[in-house]
Every structure is written in structure tokens, then in C-alpha cells.
Amino acid sequence: MSESLLQTVVAYVELVLHHFMALSWTQQLSIVIVAPFIYSLVWQTLYSFRKDRVPLVPFMVPWVGSALAYGRAPYEFFGKCQQKYGDVFAFMLLGRVMTVYLGTKGHEFILNAKLAEVSAEEAYTKLTTPVFGEGVVYDCPNHRLMEQKKFCKNALSTEAFRRYVPMVMDEVRKYLRTSKHFMMNERSSGVVNVMETQPEMTIFTASRSLLGAEMHSMLDADFAYLYADLDKGFTPLNFVFRDLPLDNYRRRDNAQRTISSTYMKVIERRRKNNDVQDRDLIDALMTSAQYKDGVKMTDQQIANLLIGVLMGGQHTSAATSAWVLLHLAERPDIQEELYEEQMRVLDGGAKELTYELLQEMPLLNQVIKETLRMHHPLHSLFRKVTRDMPVPNTSYVIPKDHYVLASPGFCHLSEEYFPNAKEFNPHRWDNDAASSVSTGEKVDYGFGAISKGVSSPYLPFGGGRHRCIGEGFAYMQLGTIFSVVVRSMKWHFPADMKGVPNPDFTSMVTLPSEPCRIAWERRVPDQII
């Protein structure tokens, strides 16, 4: 900018300020309040004139945009927008332009986008780094994340699952015996809140199997609540603001420090005593967490990655297991079918459950699969656009620094793909009991070969390079939990519950809203759990 032009601009600014300061305070306040609305209206008008932009959902409040409608009921919001604009549209979310592409073509466009076009790291780092900690997951380059996934691969192998099943089974039995919510060896019935029991049950089973006996011995029910505080750090507000002086932010930070410190104590003790063996994921990371370029993960980064691994294996499993209990409370007929399947496969209880026997229980897997269809753990998957992205077969171009959003969960509830989509029906999978789509061309992003295709209408674990690597663990964990639970008790809704509660979308993880209780009774009154 030339000196003369700069002087002209400064002169105009001074003139405007002079006239502004000459106004009364009420006039000044009116301008300050009205100006953003005028700017927003002009911006939306100019946006609508551009033929290379996807349709934008109009909004009244500047910056906030459609945040309230989206945050309260995202699937309902998507459905209304789809009816008006089609599968591709944009909306304003707290100062960010979000381009939504619904349906299977949207899955392919966003989840299989080139690394040069979109970034999950830039989209999620404000949300995830305060929860997991620095240097891991989305607080590092993508190639580092791919290697971190590979470090965890052995803990998520079929051989590992064979070891985990007895551990998970033992933990569930122990929980049913000793938890204040059940105390089954002393009580024959009771009423429990599933969002109190299931986070505890899943944290105990995940920690016992993934982190080993030493770490597990340091955990109690309060540890599950710390992870719940981390869960509450996953909200649309956290997506925009990394730090705010609010209670849920403070609780998130306290939980992160406490959990990280607990892991560090174990790591430091093992280092000090030269006690690194091959017992659990902690040992595995302490011995093998070295990147291809020779850089080793620090112990603090290992602790942070452990938070991420257990978080991935806990918060979604807790939500899913809660939904399973709630849906089965409404379907005692399916409870009985599950019990009959257990008795048939386990020879009336004469056989102990194994990983191989879990694979012989199709209905159990179908219940989990149907629950994941109806309640995708994450209702929205984001990427930040790092290079202008043309939308195939349209004139639209999504500009750099906008965001793209895919919603497999919306597809899961579409009548186009799943007839009677709002009905819980595990038998819709009778001819397709496998956990997820696994056929077709494979691709290796650095952590093992996975299915390349993401155009399926059923993607409970996402797709592409950021696909969740814990699908096998989730089915093993949830299958083992409900094998024990179904053999131990029957359950239904208490009198004040009118059916399966609606989802609560205030968190990024789809949880059941309160009240979410079940009334249970022991299946065999004198049986020792």
C-alpha cells in the first residue's frame, strides 16, 4: 500500500471516528448493535449471488448462525435443510461456514478427501488437545497420528481379544456383585441409571484389558466420572473456543491433569525399576513408540495417548451400552432370544465364554450393530478445507478455510437405506451379521489395511484415514458385557419411564437424555454371580 493511499485511509477513519464520537451514547450503542446485523445481511446477500457457492441456510443472529437449531437436534435440522436445498448446503456455526454433504456421496467426498484438501487436525485440535493433551492425536501432523495408531495395533489384534474376553467377563461379574448400583449377591432387584452404571462398567473393563492389572488397581468409580468430565469437553462451544472461564472447561482441565498424572506415575515407576515387560498397552508404548524418523514419544505423550485410547474405548462404548440396555428394556422378547442364544452356544452354561464363541452369537452382534445404527456415537464428522474443493458434478466450490461436515448417523436413520429406520430391529441384519463393511478394495494409511470404500450408508466407525481402529475391540467388549448381563438379569422400564428416551445432543457424543433408568431383577434368584 502506497504512503499516499495509507494517509487517505487514515484520514477517512479519523473522520468517521470524529462523527461517531459526536453522537449521543444511545446513538453510538444503536450503531454498535445494529452494524453486525447489517453486515451479516449484506454478507448473506452477496453470498447468495455467487453461483459457485452451495446454498446457505439463512440466519438472523450474526456469528451464531444456525448453532441453536443444529445443536438442539442436528438430524432434524439436516432433514429440514435437505428437503429445501438437497444433499449439499451450508450453514453458519459460531463464525464458521459449515458445508454439509449428506448421503453416501457425501461420505465419499468428505471422508475420502485428499490430505491436501482437508485437515481433521485443524478442525479438531481446539476440541481434542485440551482433552487428550499435547503431541498426540490431532495435536500433531497426520503422519504422526497414523504411526500412533500403528503403535496401538497389537493391543487391538485378534490374539489380544482372546486374552481380553476372560478379563472383561471377570470385571462385569465383579461389577454386578460389588457395585452399589447392583450388589447382586445381596439384592434380587433394583433400579439403576444407565448413565451411571455403563460409564463405570466400560471404564473398568477397558482399563483391565488395555492397561493391565497395575493401572486397573488404581482406578475406582470416581475415575469414570473424570472421564465423564472429559466427555463434557466435547461440545460445539469447545469446537470454537479452546479455553473459556466456565465450569465445564475447569472440570475438563482438572480431569485431564488427574488422569494424566495417574498414568505418569505408572510409567515413571516402571522406568525407575526397569520394569518394562510385555503385559499391556503401557509396556507396548514404552518399548515401541518410536516414529520412522527416529523420534521417540516422550513419557508425557505416551500418557496423553493412553487417555486418547481409553477415551476412544470408553465414551462411545459407554453410550452404546446404555442405549442397548434402554432398547432391550422395551423389548423383553429380544432379551429372551439373546438368553436362548447364550444357552445354546455355551451349552447351558457349561462352557466359559471365549472370543471364538462370541463369533457364534449372531443375534448378540446384531443387537450391537442395530444400536450403533440408531445411535451413531458422533452425529457430525468435521474437516477443515485447506484447498478450494470443487463438489463433483456441480458448479459449487467450497473455499479454503471453510469446513465440511459428513453425518453417517443421518444416513443410518434414513428410510432410503433402512426401511422403518426409527424402529429398533436387530433382525434386519439376519443376513448380514458381520460387524461392519469390510469387503472391497483395501488401503493402508500407515496403521494397517482397512476398507477403502466409504460410500456405504452404514459407517458407525467412520471411514478413510481417520476411521476408528477400535471396532473389533468395541464388539469384543460390548459382546462380552452383554453375554454376562443377559445371563445374569432381566430388565424393563420403571413405571415413570415411558419408553426409550430421546437423544441428548448437547455433547458431541450422542447420549440418552434423562431420565434413563431401568428396573432389573436377577434372572436366576439363587445364582452366584
UniProtKB/Swiss-Prot annotation:
Please give an example of a GO cellular component term from this record: perinuclear endoplasmic reticulum
Q: What is this protein called?
A: Lanosterol 14-alpha demethylase
Q: What is its EC number?
A: 1.14.14.154
| Record function comment | Sterol 14alpha-demethylase that plays a critical role in the third module of ergosterol biosynthesis pathway, being ergosterol the major sterol component in fungal membranes that participates in a variety of functions. The third module or late pathway involves the ergosterol synthesis itself through consecutive reactions that mainly occur in the endoplasmic reticulum (ER) membrane. In filamentous fungi, during the initial step of this module, lanosterol (lanosta-8,24-dien-3beta-ol) can be metabolized to eburicol.
Q: Which residues bind heme?
A: 468
| Originating organism | Eremothecium gossypii (strain ATCC 10895 / CBS 109.51 / FGSC 9923 / NRRL Y-1056)
Per UniProt, the keywords (alphabetical) are: Heme, Iron, Lipid biosynthesis, Lipid metabolism, Membrane, Metal-binding, Monooxygenase, Oxidoreductase, Steroid biosynthesis, Steroid metabolism, Sterol biosynthesis, Sterol metabolism
Per the record, what are the reactions this protein catalyses?
a 14alpha-methyl steroid + 3 reduced [NADPH--hemoprotein reductase] + 3 O2 = a Delta(14) steroid + formate + 3 oxidized [NADPH--hemoprotein reductase] + 4 H2O + 4 H(+); a 14alpha-methyl steroid + reduced [NADPH--hemoprotein reductase] + O2 = a 14alpha-hydroxymethyl steroid + oxidized [NADPH--hemoprotein reductase] + H2O + H(+); a 14alpha-hydroxymethyl steroid + reduced [NADPH--hemoprotein reductase] + O2 = a 14alpha-formyl steroid + oxidized [NADPH--hemoprotein reductase] + 2 H2O + H(+); a 14alpha-formyl steroid + reduced [NADPH--hemoprotein reductase] + O2 = a Delta(14) steroid + formate + oxidized [NADPH--hemoprotein reductase] + H2O + 2 H(+)
The gene that this protein is the product of is ERG11
UniProt xrefs under SUPFAM superfamilies: Cytochrome P450 (SSF48264)
| Localization in the cell | Membrane
Pfam families the UniProt entry points to: p450 (PF00067)
